[in-house]
């Protein structure tokens, strides 16, 4: 069992039951999935960009991402339907908890001028989104072997009904909120 998964069962669940007064353990919010998404609009000109991004996401997530394709043609962006324009990977279960552990304890402290993540990035339904400007904050990525700095979006989906419940859940996982 992953370290954060054990931590969730032993420390987070009792803490949230006490804070919000849940009657059942099944009412306690939990993280269902973490989605990593890399939008690569510049990949229209060069197919090698997609391969490098897929390689980076594979190292970061520990599983192979799916290449996302354009749903419809947009002449202004010079893309046609079916063009590869991004890569995404969905993490669940053990891989999700291991990624969350690495992200909170190792990757976030490596961000330059880091003062904490925003507490306002919740969507109103208990899900949290965070944008990472450069993939080199992850220790799996070797700085000398990357071709370009790429950002990615990390979406944390929870079963929480409100943003307050979701924030309490993530804060109990030692998420460094600044406000």
Swiss-Prot record:
Keywords: Ribonucleoprotein, Ribosomal protein, RNA-binding, rRNA-binding, tRNA-binding. Pfam families: Ribosomal_L5, Ribosomal_L5_C. GO terms for molecular function: rRNA binding; structural constituent of ribosome; tRNA binding. GO terms for cellular component: ribonucleoprotein complex; ribosome. Gene3D superfamilies: 3.30.1440.10. GO terms for biological process: translation. The keyword Transit peptide does not apply. SUPFAM superfamilies: RL5-like. It comes from the Bacteria. The keyword RNA-binding applies. InterPro entries: Ribosomal_uL5, Ribosomal_uL5_bac-type, Ribosomal_uL5_C, Ribosomal_uL5_CS, Ribosomal_uL5_dom_sf, Ribosomal_uL5_N. NCBIfam families: PRK00010.1. This is one of the proteins that bind and probably mediate the attachment of the 5S RNA into the large ribosomal subunit, where it forms part of the central protuberance. In the 70S ribosome it contacts protein S13 of the 30S subunit (bridge B1b), connecting the 2 subunits; this bridge is implicated in subunit movement. Contacts the P site tRNA; the 5S rRNA and some of its associated proteins might help stabilize positioning of ribosome-bound tRNAs. Belongs to the universal ribosomal protein uL5 family. Part of the 50S ribosomal subunit; part of the 5S rRNA/L5/L18/L25 subcomplex. Contacts the 5S rRNA and the P site tRNA. Forms a bridge to the 30S subunit in the 70S ribosome. This is Large ribosomal subunit protein uL5.
């Amino acid at each position: 069992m992953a370290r954060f998964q054990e931590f969730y069962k032993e420390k987070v669940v009792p803490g949230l039951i006490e804070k919000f007064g849940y009657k059942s353990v099944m009412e306690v919010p939990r993280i269902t999935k973490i989605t990593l998404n890399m939008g690569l609009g510049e990949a229209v000109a060069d197919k090698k960009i997609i391969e490098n991004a897929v390689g980076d996401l594979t190292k970061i997530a520990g599983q192979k991402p799916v290449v996302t394709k354009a749903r419809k043609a947009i002449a202004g962006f010079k893309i046609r339907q079916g063009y590869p324009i991004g890569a995404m990977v969905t993490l669940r279960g053990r891989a999700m908890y291991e990624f969350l552990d690495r992200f909170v304890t190792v990757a976030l402290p490596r961000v330059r001028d880091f003062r904490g993540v925003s507490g306002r990035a919740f969507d109103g339904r208990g899900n949290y989104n965070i944008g990472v400007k450069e993939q080199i904050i992850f220790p799996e990525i070797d700085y000398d072997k990357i071709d370009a700095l790429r950002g990615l979006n990390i979406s944390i989906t929870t079963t929480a009904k409100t943003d307050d419940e979701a924030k309490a859940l993530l804060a109990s996982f030692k998420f460094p909120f600044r406000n």
